[in-house]
């Protein structure tokens, strides 16, 4: 039974949506118990004199009554509620905040744009893998946050008064998706960004991550259309052209775009295009968390330490009581194999990292049953929250685990959108071999294996006499050669006198 005192809640009263996150701490990370989101569109109820309409207030209070039921058994000291752009602007915000606090039974804090940006960055730093030198972009309903940081520290942060709801009302209020409306929206956004761009550019970054509903919508569109997870300027321009072709907001149809996100998608897209243009962004991926996660980690005083993905995988190993020594053997072999054929097979550091990640948890399916263990492993990875991994990376790892032995499903390997299909297939081949060679579960039983690749033909070169001295693994390798031949992957076994 989960004690209420072990629960924490973070509530974000945004300009477009209200969100609630309920978690508990497990092994130094967060286990999500509930996520509730309601479209309130508070910013749409802001009049020209910055007064919030009574209808918008009623929508907000109605949503908070739903949230309040979840909070009844959580100590108020373990609840944090913040309000952002719209309630910063509203001249009559106090009229909304008093009843809101009474409904929730705890205070509502209207945070500054800079504090919002800081919390967003903390949420990203705690949940997103990759380089520690990052630019974070969060397009909210009423504001857009831009932050450059290293590790857990935000170095430059800005909150700009533009968001997908306010830009919708200002530049698409006629609901027409014309080129002229897009150009006006983009130009206005660029004028907001330009005064701060030089300070962000001066810091520099290695990766760019997006932490907004607009970026989430783009991810959903790209997955639905079979594209990879990287958001690029060319993809944004294609989507803009598609929106213009649809003509009217009510007629906007893009494969993968949900009805819920469609209303503010064009305005968010216009802002994102401006961000790309002013900051010279080449590629962006989706962040693992943002404002609410930043609030939560701050409340629980959990440090940002080490590699987030490594911490996630080690937590999985503990949770499912995996044999970490065996995981290390397979990981070491798989990584070594990949580096031997890296040039011939065009494998880079990203490939090495993802292969190591899959190898570290390849036996996770055994925690359910040895029968269909690869399928169990894939299911667990697909349906577990993995901080530090993007949805596409998570899908790739699950696919590699599902294809770690016996039958090979080429369709699955080709449909993941993290790596090119051919590269995913090659990683699969290498991990399967690593598992076979490590099957004795002893360090002193690992042979000196040399791999060579010529296009798709893979040569496995072993010391002279090794196959006859190890008949079981020799049989596994012969079977593996057969499995790979079924999908037209030539695997040839050779022995050499050189050890």
UniProtKB/Swiss-Prot annotation:
Keywords assigned: Hydrolase
Pathway: Purine metabolism; ppGpp biosynthesis; ppGpp from GTP: step 2/2
EC number: 3.6.1.40
InterPro entries: ATPase_NBD (IPR043129), GppA/Ppx_hydrolase (IPR050273), Guo-5TP_3DP_PyrP (IPR023709), Ppx_GppA_C (IPR048950), Ppx_GppA_N (IPR003695), PyroPPase_GppA_Ppx (IPR030673)
Molecular-function annotations in GO: guanosine-5'-triphosphate,3'-diphosphate diphosphatase activity
Catalytic activity: guanosine 3'-diphosphate 5'-triphosphate + H2O = guanosine 3',5'-bis(diphosphate) + phosphate + H(+)
Enzyme class name: hydrolase
Biological process terms in GO annotation: guanosine pentaphosphate catabolic process; guanosine tetraphosphate biosynthetic process; nucleobase-containing small molecule interconversion
Pfam families: Ppx-GppA, Ppx-GppA_III
Domain of life: Bacteria
Function: Catalyzes the conversion of pppGpp to ppGpp. Guanosine pentaphosphate (pppGpp) is a cytoplasmic signaling molecule which together with ppGpp controls the 'stringent response', an adaptive process that allows bacteria to respond to amino acid starvation, resulting in the coordinated regulation of numerous cellular activities.
Family classification: Belongs to the GppA/Ppx family. GppA subfamily.
Name of this chain's protein: Guanosine-5'-triphosphate,3'-diphosphate pyrophosphatase
